[in-house]
C-alpha cells in the first residue's frame, strides 16, 4: 500500500471475476459515500451489452472479500463489481473447477463498458463526489435506542447529532455536485476535495468495524450484539437456577422426601457417638 495515495486518489476500481455471471444482474458494490454518484451515473447510461436479464444496481458497503476493502479503510474510496452472489464462491472459486467453462463473453464486455464509462465519469469531476449523508443515516439506523436507554447512554443526543451531520453532508454534496455540473464557481474545488478525502479517512476510522465472520458493521453493532448475548445468557442462567431450585425443593416434597430436601440445603449433622 502507498500511504501517499491517501488524500490524493479519489477512487479505486477493483475487478473480480468480470467474465463470470453472478445472479441476474450486474452490481457495483461501493463505499456508502459513492452510492449517490453511482446511482446518478446509472440513470444516464447508454445501451450496453446485454450481459444480464435485469438492470444494473448499486449496493453498499464494501465487503471484506476483496482488496478494495483494505484500500477503502486506508482512506481511498473504493468500488468493485459485486461478485459474491451465488454458490460459485463456495464451490468453484480458487479451485480446479474454476476454469474457462464459466467465461461469459457478454458479461465480460458489459463489465468493461460499464466500468470504462464510470472511470471517465469520475475523471470528469472537479470535486470527488462523496456524499456522507448516507453514512450518517446508516449509523443512526444501526443505533439501538432501547439498549441506550437500558444502559443509561445518551442515544437520543447521538441520533440527533447524526441527523444534523447527515443534513450538513447533503448540503456539501449538493455543492460539490453543482461544481461538477458547471453550475457553481469552482475556485474552491481543490480545497473542498481535500476536505472530503480527509473526512472519508475519518469516517472509515470511526465508523467501520468487522465482526468475527468478516461482516462490515458500525462500532455500536458489535457492542449491541454483545449486550444481547449477555442478556440472553443471564436469562438462561436465571431459568436454569429456577429449574434447579424446583428440582431440589418441590419434587422431593411431592414424593414424600421432606427430610432429603432439607438436608440438601443444610450442612450434614455430626454422627452421635
PLM regions: where:
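Secretory-pathway/membrane protein signature
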Residues: 1-273
Amino acid at each position: 500500500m502507498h500511504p501517499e495515495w491517501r488524500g490524493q486518489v479519489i477512487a479505486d476500481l477493483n475487478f473480480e471475476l468480470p467474465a463470470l455471471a453472478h445472479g441476474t444482474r450486474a452490481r457495483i458494490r461501493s463505499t456508502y459515500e459513492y452510492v449517490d454518484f453511482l446511482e446518478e451515473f446509472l440513470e444516464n447510461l447508454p445501451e450496453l451489452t446485454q450481459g444480464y436479464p435485469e438492470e444494473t444496481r448499486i449496493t453498499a458497503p464494501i465487503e471484506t472479500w476483496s482488496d478494495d476493502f483494505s484500500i477503502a479503510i486506508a482512506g481511498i474510496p473504493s468500488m468493485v463489481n459485486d461478485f459474491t452472489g451465488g454458490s460459485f464462491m463456495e464451490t468453484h472459486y480458487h479451485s480446479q473447477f474454476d476454469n474457462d467453462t464459466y467465461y461469459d463473453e457478454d458479461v465480460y464486455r458489459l463489465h468493461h463498458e460499464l466500468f470504462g464509462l464510470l472511470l471517465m465519469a469520475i475523471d470528469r469531476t472537479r470535486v470527488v463526489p462523496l456524499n456522507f449523508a448516507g453514512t450518517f443515516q446508516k449509523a443512526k439506523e444501526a443505533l439501538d435506542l432501547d439498549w441506550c436507554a437500558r444502559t443509561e447512554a445518551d442515544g437520543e443526543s447521538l441520533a440527533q447529532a447524526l441527523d444534523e451531520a447527515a443534513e450538513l453532508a447533503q448540503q456539501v454534496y449538493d455543492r460539490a455536485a453543482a461544481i461538477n455540473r458547471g453550475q457553481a464557481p469552482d475556485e474552491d474545488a481543490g480545497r473542498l476535495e481535500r476536505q472530503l478525502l480527509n473526512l472519508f479517512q475519518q469516517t472509515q476510522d470511526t465508523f467501520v468495524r468487522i465482526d468475527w465472520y468478516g461482516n462490515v458493521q458500525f462500532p455500536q453493532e458489535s457492542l449491541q450484539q454483545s449486550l444481547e448475548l449477555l442478556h440472553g445468557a443471564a436469562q438462561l442462567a436465571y431459568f436454569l437456577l429456577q429449574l434447579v431450585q424446583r428440582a431440589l425443593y418441590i419434587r422431593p416434597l411431592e414424593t414424600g422426601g421432606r427430610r432429603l430436601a432439607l438436608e440438601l440445603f443444610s450442612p450434614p449433622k455430626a454422627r452421635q457417638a
